[in-house]
Amino acid sequence: ITQRLVGSVLLGAMVVVAGCGSGRLVLPFQIDPASLVAPRDARTLTSHGAAVRGLSAILVKDLGLPMPPSFTVYVYSGREVFERGLVHDAQVTPVRAAELSEFAVGIGKRRQLLLNDDAGQAHGREWLRLIAHELAHVSQIEMAGGEGRAEQWLAEGMSEYVAFTALERLGLDTVANRRALATAGIRNHAALVAARLDLETLGNPRGFTVRHLREGSLPTYQLAFLMADYLITRDGFDRVVGYFRSFDRRHDRHANFRDTFGQSLDQFEQEVLGHLKTVVR
């Protein structure tokens, strides 16, 4: 992908470099936690740069999540250029990039955030939710020391929790409202009907993708959010953060879950299944 530099603007610790003509915008960020100020007015987050910086501040200041000292945001103008960007900027295999571009509008990777900003997409609440969700993935990967190590359902569910919390801080939504919507949304989910969540499959990236393509993207993400929300309510947000940090020391998803939360994945699956069956009645 060719890139033409058209400008450079210093925003605090952030340098914005725009590339146009290729449908690709590149925004390098440098994060100094001491200089971050968490915004409270969503009306100030009108550009890609302002949104990423403001939401990063909420993650760091309000939620205590670490962000890498530097990372790059890639913004693409449509599905085809997004697919090419996944291959050339994020080193995703062409087959996987083609699959992801069919449904994903954002991807968080190791010190990278890739966004499909289709021309018809409004930059409102859901746009901010998307960015916050993917920034949470960037933070998780930084803590774990690599991609795809932690339980995928927990990575997705925690990212939704973080995104909804960010929207709440901005006065755009509440976690309680999203919890209620998710509870209603999973009432007829296949996993609940079958009384089998199958966290072993939901725990790896490929399995999670297969499940949400088969069972529906929205209810699968709602299920992941409710499971993560249950774990956060039970054990605390800091414990979940510690779980992701544990992968920097040991790459054993089952042992890390057991040592962090005091039970096996199978035991948690039965516990959270019982909880979900109760709340959806």
Locate each region found by the language model:
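C-terminal motif of bacterial Sec signal peptides marking the signal peptidase cleavage site
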Residues: 17-19
